[in-house]
Amino acid sequence: VGWAVVCVAGMFALAACGQQDGLAGTYRSVEELPEELGRDGTTVTVGDPRALVTVHLYEDLRCPVCEEFEISGAGPDLREATLEGTAKTQYTLASFLDDRVGGSGSKKAVNALRAALEEGKFAEYHEVLYANQPEEVVDGYTDAFLLELAGQVEGLRGPEFDDAVRTMKYRGFVTASQKAYEMAGGPAEPEGPGTPTAVVNGTPIPAEYNGILMDGAAFTELLESVGRATLWEADRT
């Protein structure tokens, strides 16, 4: 994969100009990470906003390849980079698999994650959901299961969160997030770019290089290369 990392990093270097050059902070645990909803109303950002590298992920909570990325692929390495302050992670949460395989689990999971964001627990809950992902064809993200999993995140369960899960309080967010996912595909992919898709500093990782998402060492090398290129551009300007 090494040569592919070099090729991909070169593309990202061209888009590096204009990124922030402040020194980002480090965090001891996921619980400490800043998280916020963007002005577009759909993008959730986790990590120090001053981080030189931004990784924007497009995911569907029922997607087994997303689970592979998050659990055994490069997801843990991205999490470590976010904790170190060298990268921040953004999420656009799709729910198209409900229509494709039936059920409402994706929508319910996205709604529950939005409720967790209100409690400052998005990143922690996101980890728990993927660690306990049901089979794709099983509509397993029920209200009861989502609440049970929320019990694994200290301080998340409470009347407001529980009610938001049971009533689909953030249905509008779920719909808007799916539309944002579809728009990200552009004219070539009007139904969305596929999940998982990673966009690094505004440049999508090409589909032919998606193997990087399952190779933690290669993904870390990519992030470091992009970070160096971004810092170099910042020093020039």
Briefly describe each language-model feature range.
Residues 68-71, 82-83, 114-121, 127-135, ...:
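Sec-exported extracytoplasmic/periplasmic mature domains
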Residues 67-144:
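Structural alpha/beta surface segment adjacent to cysteine/selenocysteine redox centers
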Residues 1-101, 225-237:
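Extracytoplasmic thiol/disulfide redox context detector
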Residues 58-60, 92-95, 127-130, 166, ...:
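Active-site-proximal beta-strand/loop segments in catalytic clefts of secreted hydrolases
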Residues 146-148:
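Flexible, glycine-rich surface segments
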Residues 21-25, 152-237:
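C-terminal cap of thioredoxin/glutaredoxin-like
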Residues 52, 109, 192-195:
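A structure-centric signal for secondary-structure junctions around beta-strands
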